[in-house]
Amino acid sequence: MTTNNSNFKYPKDFLWGLATSAGQVEGAAAEDGRTPSIWDVFATKPGKIFNGETPAVACDSYHRFDRDVEMLKYIGVNSYRMSISWSRVLPQGTGKLNPLGVDYYKRCFEKLLKAGILPNITLYHWDLPQALEERGGWVNRDSIEWFGEYAYKMFREFGNIVPMWT
């Protein structure tokens, strides 16, 4: 079967992008106030992750985000879906925000926008703060309040610069 796509055009508002998650690319797992997530703890269990890899360094996007944005721009994407590490912005899962974590994400979102790339933010990608897991995790009825507080704080901090949320 032959398909001729020479006349095909994407719609003007089509979003062409890539996606990552904080735990898979950020690294810096114990820097600037970030506390462990359930994924960090799981990854330290022998035999659970190939070659014993952990999210501690990952792709080191935390330290290389400028270069990452340059590569995204070079590829030609106009959208980038990434997640916020809940334990980077709220080290205890609830309560006081970590200003270093908030500042990191604010800089990321601003760099993406300056490069013409729309940030599309995922609030949760399998990385519940370990502090909340120790309080019962998702099966604790309070988890509804925990997530609501987290979501509210993220929208309050970034809602004016982040156009898309998942």
Model-predicted regions and their roles:
Residues 69-166:
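Substrate-binding cleft and catalytic face of glycoside hydrolase catalytic domains
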Residues 2-98, 102, 108-111:
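N-terminal structural segment of carbohydrate-active enzymes
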Residues 1-2, 121:
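Intrinsically disordered/low-complexity terminal segments and short unstructured peptides
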